[in-house]
């Protein structure tokens, strides 16, 4: 089984920025990748949902329309206009880095940005990293490790074993007679994820986290549970 966080960075960015639209889309199950494909296609470049995935969340990490086709670049401009809360949060982070030469994430981790200054265009130096670090730091530096530990603890009485993790995916070797039990563990963890974060960091997330599971005879040939 592969248990993979659904849109982890986007959910974390929505929480950290408290972007109302992003939070609404997450709770309603809005298909953001199909929307990205539509924006690019409407700009004149036919794009599938799969092709759009590489663009959907790229602006979260400082990517811009530079080096993209005109139709693709239109999405990057659209992202900033659509998610005003995320854009405002990015600006706030930039101001913090210029003023204090560091930024602090919600879990208390600090990222030093010495010699950060304002460029002639108004943007701070190191802006890509300034946008990126708080999201990646909380998502994969704080959330994923404690969930891995919790999953390992819940599997401990069983013969199924957590064997690997890659970024925000967890790979479980399931004993043939324990498939349903492991599925139930993942389902129960989905009910508890936000509480797990609070118990470890005293951070109360108002955006739901979600694990999506796939099962198969090997890591390549899997199907959604």
Locate each region found by the language model:
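Conserved catalytic core of nucleotide polymerization and phosphodiester-bond processing enzymes
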Residues: 1-225
């Amino acid at each position: 089984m592969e248990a993979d966080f659904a849109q982890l960075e986007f959910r974390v960015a929505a929480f950290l920025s408290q972007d109302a639209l992003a939070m609404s889309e997450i709770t309603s199950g809005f298909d953001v990748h199909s929307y990205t494909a539509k924006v690019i296609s409407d700009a004149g470049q036919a794009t599938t949902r799969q092709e759009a995935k590489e663009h959907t969340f790229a602006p979260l990490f400082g990517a811009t329309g530079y080096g993209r086709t005109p139709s693709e670049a239109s999405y990057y401009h659209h992202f900033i206009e659509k998610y005003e809360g995320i854009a405002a949060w990015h600006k706030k982070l930039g101001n913090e880095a210029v003023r204090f030469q560091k930024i602090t994430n919600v879990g208390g981790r600090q990222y030093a940005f010495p010699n950060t200054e304002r460029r002639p265009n108004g943007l701070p130096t190191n802006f890509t990293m300034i946008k990126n670090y708080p999201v990646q730091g909380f998502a994969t530096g704080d959330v994923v490790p404690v969930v891995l530990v919790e999953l390992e603890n819940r599997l401990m009485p069983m013969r199924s074993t957590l064997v690997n993790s890659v970024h925000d995916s967890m790979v479980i070797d399931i004993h043939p007679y324990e498939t349903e039990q492991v599925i139930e563990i993942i389902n129960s963890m989905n009910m508890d994820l936000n509480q797990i974060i609070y118990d470890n960091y005293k951070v109360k997330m108002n955006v739901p986290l979600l694990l999506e599971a796939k099962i198969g005879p090997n890591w390549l040939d899997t199907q959604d549970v």
